[in-house]
Amino acid sequence: MSIQVEKLTKIYGTQRALDEISFEAKQGEILGFLGPNGAGKSTTMKILTGYIPQTSGIAKVCGFDVSTQTMEVKKHIGYLPELNPLYTDMFVKEYLMFSAEVQGLGKDAKSRVDEMIERVGLSLERKKKIGQLSKGYKQRVGLAQAMLHNPKVLILDEPTSGLDPNQVVEIRELIKEIGKDKTVLLSTHIMQEVESMCNRVIIINHGKIVADDNIAALQQQSKHELTIVVEFKNEIKESILKNIEGVKVIKQKGKKYLLKCSADVREQISTISSQQGWVLLSMSLEEDSLESVFQKLTNK
């Protein structure tokens, strides 16, 4: 496994930022690390990159222990933190050459820099100062720097934070391409991010892992509760809908009604509407989104 974490714990004073979390990630996997602010996502990433020590537990990257083999771990990791640290007064290629030299690439530095500039789409920006670039292109510079030494594992903390919609799409596509031959651990609190990029998702809340599965399986967890959206043209008696067996909760939004049900009751609704003289404009069955699963797991 590229990443192995076992009973990882981090304590700040009386606060358990991480509480014995365990997970693994393999090559070719884009693993989404999803959770509300303060859940423990960034803390986990900082431990994996050797930035801060854990209180207890084991974390390994490509078989190397982050506590006792920190330098070996860093050779195998590319890290893009949430606040991308760049020298804004340096030119793009100049900065990447400097980074390559710091990483000890030696005679391979120029070829690797040129390769990364091409791969992340910086060819037209290579002679610009970093401070002149848009946020999206600055993220590309950060990704290029993180991949210069050809690491097996990429750790990306909120990689699309602050980008406009077009930049978000571009960076997501780039990460998906990178993830074909590397292990990518991607932290976010945006559900669409996970759905569009990740093979698997871990949901973390209050320092504990509350879910670890692929997206379809997570959505399947709450299939016992269906949402039926019904819209009527005229006024109806909500109490009649509530009396349908299987209807648990009704929420009204204008002339639309959201019914939380334990079974598919669309046929009963259609029959009752006809009997009561209600004009039924539309009725649809909605699957639980990852967002609804996330809310259920983190609102505890």
Over which residues does each language-model region extend?
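A generic structural signal for secondary-structure junctions
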Residues: G78, Y95, G104, I202, ...
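A short linear hydrophobic-aromatic micro-motif
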Residues: G121, G246-K251, V279-S284
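ABC transporter nucleotide-binding domains
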Residues: S2-V5, K10-N205, A211
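C-terminal coupling/interaction segments
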Residues: C261-K300
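ABC transporter nucleotide-binding domain
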Residues: E170-K260
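Short, Lys/Arg-enriched, disordered terminal segments
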Residues: M1-I3, N299-K300
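Short beta->alpha junction loops/turns
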Residues: V66, K233-N234, S262, E286
